[in-house]
Swiss-Prot record:
NCBIfam families: rplX_bact (TIGR01079). The keyword Transcription regulation does not apply. It comes from Zymomonas mobilis subsp. mobilis (strain ATCC 31821 / ZM4 / CP4). InterPro entries: KOW, Rib_uL2_dom2, Ribosomal_uL24, Ribosomal_uL24_CS, Ribosomal_uL24_KOW, Translation_prot_SH3-like_sf. SMART domains: KOW. One of two assembly initiator proteins, it binds directly to the 5'-end of the 23S rRNA, where it nucleates assembly of the 50S subunit. This is Large ribosomal subunit protein uL24. GO terms for biological process: translation.
Length: 105
């Protein structure tokens, strides 16, 4: 199946604690149906002290979020939109449904 959301895309979070926030996809995990978005779904991991890290402490990191919970940001309006595919000049391109604009990538 074609990838509607790719690395580098601007997306809008549709549900959850970060609903309404915008971010950029830093990693797409198509096998799991998830994406990692910069600054979204931040989790805290408690690290025990070890020889490599004698202090231990808290690590904050971005966790994957379900791809169904994000939507591509329309390049024209900045709002969430669905994506369709079209062939233009012999190349398959992604098109924002709301505005008809071509999505880069």
């Amino acid at each position: 199946m074609a990838a509607k959301i790719k690395k580098g895309d601007r997306v809008v979070i549709l549900s959850g604690k970060d609903k309404g926030k915008h971010g950029e996809v830093t990693q797409a995990l198509p096998q799991e149906g998830k994406v990692i978005v910069s600054g979204i779904n931040i989790i805290t991991r408690h690290r025990k002290p070890s020889q490599a890290n004698p202090q231990g402490g808290l690590d904050r990191m971005e966790a994957p979020i379900a791809a169904s919970k994000v939507a591509i940001e329309d390049p024209k309006t900045g709002k969430a939109t669905r994506v369709r595919f079209d062939v233009r000049d012999g190349k398959k391109v992604r098109i924002a449904v709301k505005s008809g604009e071509t999505i880069n990538g």
